[in-house]
Each structure stands twice: as structure tokens, then as C-alpha cells.
């Protein structure tokens, strides 16, 4: 077996059992990158000699009992890394090299992990695509904004990668690239040292090859950070504990198609309905839930919040470099400038209404099941896809997990999405692990 094909937990097990060393594993991943990166272009920055030096440093230390010992991680290039270029997907920061790492980077390194490299992001994690291609077919998009992170895990470059989501930037690329994407509850993981778009919506997420791997890594990254007030709301030990426990009984699942269902392509709808039948036959209590008219303006509402907060986040950059921003980002900022304080306040209040209504749904259900994207990845690199089936859960701050569920007619991955109650990631991930095992679909690694 090629070592690069091992997931996070399998790699830790191989280290413990003496079947692999950190140097062996990182070398295998580096060779995989050397072979496929020219076609996929998942990396904004990757230095194989530095990666091997990091591996040798880990192997020579006494970190073997740490939960991320020797695990190479892809870090989205919206996240500050000390001594490593951090460009935010923008030519404005082409020469930027931070002197301090983001909280989550310091965290993963303290737990024994190593930064394998910086993965491609869209411009400032918004809509302007980067250079990354879908590893299943390079004529198609990998999704975004966490394009490189999803592609790197799918191609076997790293077992795990970090992304961020403001609308659908973890869930959608995970679905397009055929990997597991876990977007935790907002505030579960610190955002200090990550370039913001929206303080209300921005969430750190994880790409992995299994739900168990995603949960393990996500739990490692959680912890209170005084510089990010959202992390202080509820202790991480109350959000997620690992390893995940198997469910004692099949979950109660609320099927929500949303008013955007007509946007979904027929192969995605058919795959979803077949998946729901499989879950029901396996014992899940499945019931359809229709969202009330309250949610009809959810897209307009999230854009009001996002655009207004983006104006604050980009105040300095816009004042000095507006001409160097993409039309997509300028459009967002122009929209934000038109949002009055009163309109912004109403949008925040409406967001709270969404969360309360959805929270009540979990009195009778363990998780929501829906689709993660409209279908297979779009052709070309002009668009990273539609976030319609991810934005509502992001807006409400709820945990969401994308799971591969099949291939579409173009040979590209399709997925299913499990959504949990706000700040109850444990139950969401346990339902997702059950769903993953029940569907039994393993896409394998992309890229040959």
C-alpha cells in the first residue's frame, strides 16, 4: 500500500505499530504531489525540503503521544503561517510573510502536526477563482473558496486540510472533490490570524477522507481563544468528544429540500432520494420537513450580513487597493456600503429567528439531511459553484458535514449533507458517521 493513501487515524495507527515513520509518510505524500501537482495545482506554496525537515524534527522528538503526531496538514492560504508566504489569494499580498501564525496553526503544531504547505484559496476566500482544478477531471472546478484544501485531500497530497466557510466554502468543494467536509458550529474553532470576511459567518472547517478523521482533527483544533469571543460561548468539550461513539440506534432524520430544490440537477436529486431510501431501510426514522415562508429571504438576508461586515473587514484594503480587487469583491463591498445600520440590525435579528426555528426542529430529530451542492462540479474555472444548499446552515451557525454518496454522469462526485443543532457537533458527527457507514460509498483517491 502507498502510504499517502492512509487517512489521519490510519496514519497514527501505522506510526504506533511501527509500520511507518513520519519521514516515510511525508516522503510518500511529497512524491504524490510531485507526480500530480502540475495538473491539479492545489498548492499556493509547497517546499518539499522544508516538509522533510519538519518530518525529521518530529521523528527526533518526544511527541509520539500527541494526537496529531507526524500528521502533515494542508493550510488554506487565508490563514497566517509564520515564515511562510500568506497571500490570501490576492496579488496585493504577493510578498506577505507573517511573523506570527494563526491560533489554529500554533495549535496543530503544538499537538504534533506539521504544515505541509499552503493550499490555494479564492481571492480573500470570496468568489474570484484560483488556479486549482478538480482532481477527478481537471476540466472542472474543485469548488471554492477552499479549493486547494479539498483537492489536496482528494488527490492524496495530505490526509487532512484546513479550510474556511462563510457561505459554502467547505461543504461545496468537499462535495465536488469527493471528500468529507466538516464545518463546525461557528465559534468552535478560533479564527484569530485568519483574514475575515464576516465575523458572524466565518467558520474554520476541515477536509478529510472519513467522518472519523474529520471529527478527530476538528476536536484537536477546538479550544477557547480570548482573542475570538465566539470561542468562549461554550467549552469545546461540550461540543465534541473523540473518538466518536457508534449510535445505539439509527438516527431520526429530517429531510429538508428547501425552496431552492429546483436548482438541483436531476442526477443530484436522484442520488439524494436513493440515499434517503437506503438510510430509511437501515432503520433511520425519516420524515420530510418543509421550511416555512420565514426562510424565503434567507439568501438576501445572509448577503446583507456578509456584505456589511465585509466593508469593515476590508476597510483598509479597499481604501488603498480598491483598483486591484476583483469585480466580485468590489460588488460585495458596494452592496455592503448600501446596507444601513437599521437594515443590518434587522438581518441579524432574522438570522436569530432562523436559528430558533431550526433549533426547535431538533426536539423531534437528531439531524437534518439534505444535499451539499446543486450537483456535479461546474465545467471550467470561471465559477466555484452555487452555495444555495450550504448558506442557511452557515447563517444559523450550525454544524454541517458533507459526505460522498456517488458519482454523477460526468464521473464527478456527488454528496449528501448532514446538519446538526447549533453547538451540538457531537450528535451531528455521530449521525454523519452512521450515514457514511450505511451508504458505504468510498470514492477512493482522485488523480490516478
Model-identified regions with their sequence ranges:
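Short helix-loop capping/hinge segments that flank enzyme active sites or metal/cofactor-binding pockets
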Residues: 64, 68-88, 247-256, 304-359, ...
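Acidic/His- and Gly-rich active-site-bordering loop/insert found
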Residues: 51-53, 61-131
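Short, well-ordered beta-strand elements
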Residues: 206, 412-424, 428-432, 436
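Glycine/threonine-rich flexible loop motifs
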Residues: 86-95, 265-266, 377-384
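Short glycine/serine-rich loop segments
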Residues: 100-225, 395-415
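A short helix-breaking turn/cap at a secondary-structure junction
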Residues: 183-270, 438-448
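Serine-dependent amide/ester hydrolase catalytic core
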Residues: 9-16, 31, 247-248, 311-395, ...
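An N-terminal boundary/leader segment
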Residues: 1-50, 281-283, 343, 444-448
Amino acid at each position: 500500500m502507498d502510504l499517502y493513501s492512509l487517512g489521519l487515524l490510519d496514519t497514527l495507527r501505522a506510526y504506533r505499530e511501527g509500520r511507518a515513520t513520519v519521514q516515510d509518510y511525508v516522503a510518500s505524500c511529497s512524491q504524490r504531489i510531485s507526480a500530480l501537482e502540475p495538473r491539479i495545482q492545489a498548492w499556493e506554496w509547497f517546499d518539499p525540503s522544508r516538509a522533510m525537515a519538519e518530518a525529521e524534527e518530529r521523528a527526533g522528538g518526544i511527541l509520539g503521544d500527541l494526537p496529531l503526531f507526524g500528521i502533515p496538514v494542508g493550510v488554506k492560504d487565508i490563514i497566517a503561517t509564520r515564515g511562510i508566504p500568506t497571500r490570501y489569494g490576492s496579488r496585493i499580498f504577493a510578498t506577505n510573510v507573517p511573523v506570527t501564525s494563526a491560533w489554529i496553526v500554533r495549535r496543530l503544531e503544538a499537538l504534533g502536526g506539521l504544515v505541509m504547505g499552503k493550499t490555494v484559496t479564492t481571492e480573500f476566500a470570496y468568489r474570484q477563482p484560483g488556479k486549482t482544478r478538480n482532481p477527478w477531471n481537471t476540466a472542472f472546478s474543485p469548488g471554492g473558496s477552499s479549493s486547494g484544501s479539498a483537492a489536496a485531500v482528494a488527490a492524496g497530497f495530505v490526509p487532512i486540510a484546513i479550510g474556511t466557510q462563510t457561505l459554502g466554502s467547505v461543504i461545496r468543494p468537499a462535495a465536488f472533490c469527493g471528500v468529507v467536509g466538516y464545518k463546525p458550529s461557528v465559534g468552535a474553532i478560533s479564527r484569530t490570524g485568519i483574514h475575515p470576511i464576516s465575523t458572524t459567518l466565518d467558520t474554520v472547517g476541515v477536509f478529510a477522507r472519513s467522518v472519523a478523521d474529520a471529527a478527530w482533527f476538528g476536536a484537536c483544533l477546538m479550544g477557547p481563544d480570548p482573542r475570538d469571543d465566539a470561542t468562549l460561548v461554550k467549552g469545546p468539550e461540550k461540543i465534541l468528544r473523540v473518538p466518536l461513539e457508534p449510535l445505539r440506534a439509527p438516527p431520526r432524520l429530517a429531510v429538508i429540500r428547501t425552496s431552492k430544490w429546483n436548482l438541483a440537477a436531476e442526477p443530484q436529486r436522484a442520488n439524494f432520494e436513493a440515499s434517503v431510501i437506503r438510510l430509511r431501510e437501515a432503520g433511520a426514522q425519516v420524515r420530510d420537513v418543509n421550511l416555512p415562508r420565514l426562510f424565503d429571504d434567507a439568501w438576501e438576508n445572509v448577503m446583507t450580513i456578509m456584505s456589511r461586515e465585509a466593508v469593515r473587514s476590508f476597510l483598509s484594503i479597499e481604501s488603498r487597493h480598491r483598483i486591484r480587487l476583483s469585480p466580485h469583491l468590489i460588488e460585495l463591498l458596494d452592496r455592503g456600503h448600501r446596507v444601513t445600520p437599521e437594515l443590518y440590525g434587522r438581518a441579524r435579528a432574522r438570522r436569530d429567528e432562523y436559528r430558533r426555528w431550526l433549533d426547535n426542529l431538533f426536539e423531534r430529530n437528531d439531524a437534518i439531511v439534505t444535499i451539499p451542492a446543486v450537483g456535479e462540479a461546474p465545467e471550467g474555472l470561471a465559477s466555484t459553484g452555487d452555495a444555495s444548499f450550504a448558506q442557511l446552515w452557515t447563517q444559523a451557525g450550525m454544524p454541517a458535514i458533507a459526505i460522498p454518496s456517488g458519482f454523477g454522469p460526468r464521473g464527478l462526485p456527488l454528496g449528501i449533507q448532514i446538519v446538526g443543532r447549533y453547538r451540538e457537533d457531537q450528535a451531528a458527527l455521530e449521525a454523519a458517521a452512521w450515514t457514511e457507514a450505511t451508504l458505504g460509498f468510498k470514492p477512493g483517491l482522485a488523480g490516478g
